[in-house]
């Protein structure tokens, strides 16, 4: 009942709460001379202006901060990103989970640092819903760090920008002890699903060369709905109910590569199309572009269609930002991949190719949990307890698989030793609805098995 009441009043109440958007917030602007700072340095910090919450899951936590962090774009040009640090009750300062949300937008005002706060636009609904994945991490007593990995230009799908931002966010978190109490030798696990897996995967692959000093901190990365080929995802989504992802991706690439934008603009009669591509978050983008064909069919917006990939400029951009093509980049940390066999948005074939590349490259530990009955959307939920099990095992010092291991199950709910994590996952979701505090060993309203049963069966 509390949850239903929350759903009813939140849109009204949130409309009365003024939360400055990143485009109008001076905090997002780096100070003069920031270029001289080292990547990962904290340029400025503050407590989050509003509480961390999802429209469906208000988070009762100890504290939260925003750090403005020195980073750089795909070409090595200095920039600054904001990362959000969330502290649960009774937090363990030696354990940090870097969670990369699936922002999937080319619009700066959709950034996680904004979307995760109370009072953010309804258009950021997808990010707000991801608090269900953040909450179980907080419940374990882990600090959660969530970076605006797309950077100030909102470069959705761009690999180096995203991966470097994740690593620089972690660097900053480990330097933030005087602000957050996180230890500089804290252990860190990365996690991301879909668009968040793109950023997390690139971070894992770049870490040995870009941030070798983090090798002693990083325990591994969990990658779900793993995006390794942005073209394959665009081809799968174009002309479908998920065509908005294509629009947002085109906008994100154009934000990093002006030449990409010029080539596509010359291939359409709709010259203002790119003005629209960077004006949506994920949720409203999907709604506004349902069944739109950008590069497919007779009524496509871009005349050349998929033959546009024959342009050497376009082909290079696509290859540079597809992790599946980067055989030379092999993670040195343990990796857990979970993916649905029938994923219709992120085809599993490219995940298998990346798995093969990394195995042939000598990766020390790569576990691939293939779910035989779930697609992209359902695996978000079904695969989460498996990822949580794997993450908890990493922090508890349990042994990872040696070498490469690919297991296909009917469902990832059948992942080994997952039962307690399934209970934790859904119990914490219920905790958030009841506004119970999140953290290790804290007093809460008692949740009975009957409460959990009602929640799972939709009886609330």
UniProtKB/Swiss-Prot annotation:
Record Gene3D superfamilies: 1.10.260.130, alpha/beta hydrolase
Molecular function per GO: lipase activity; triacylglycerol lipase activity
List where in the cell it is found.
Secreted
Record EC number: 3.1.1.3
Induction data: Expression is induced in medium containing Tween 40 as the sole source of carbon. Expression is up-regulated during the yeast-to-hyphal transition. Expressed during experimental infection of mice. Expressed in host cecum and infected mucosal tissues (stomach, hard palate, esophagus and tongue). Expressed at all stages of mucosal and systemic infection.
Q: Which GO terms describe its biological process?
A: lipid catabolic process
Q: Which residues are glycosylated?
A: 229, 291, 417
UniProt catalytic activity: a triacylglycerol + H2O = a diacylglycerol + a fatty acid + H(+)
Where is the signal peptide, in residue numbers?
A: 1-14
Cellular component terms (Gene Ontology): extracellular region
Q: Catalytic positions?
A: 194 (charge relay system), 343 (charge relay system), 376 (charge relay system)
Domain of life, per the record? Eukaryota
Q: What is this protein called?
A: Lipase 8
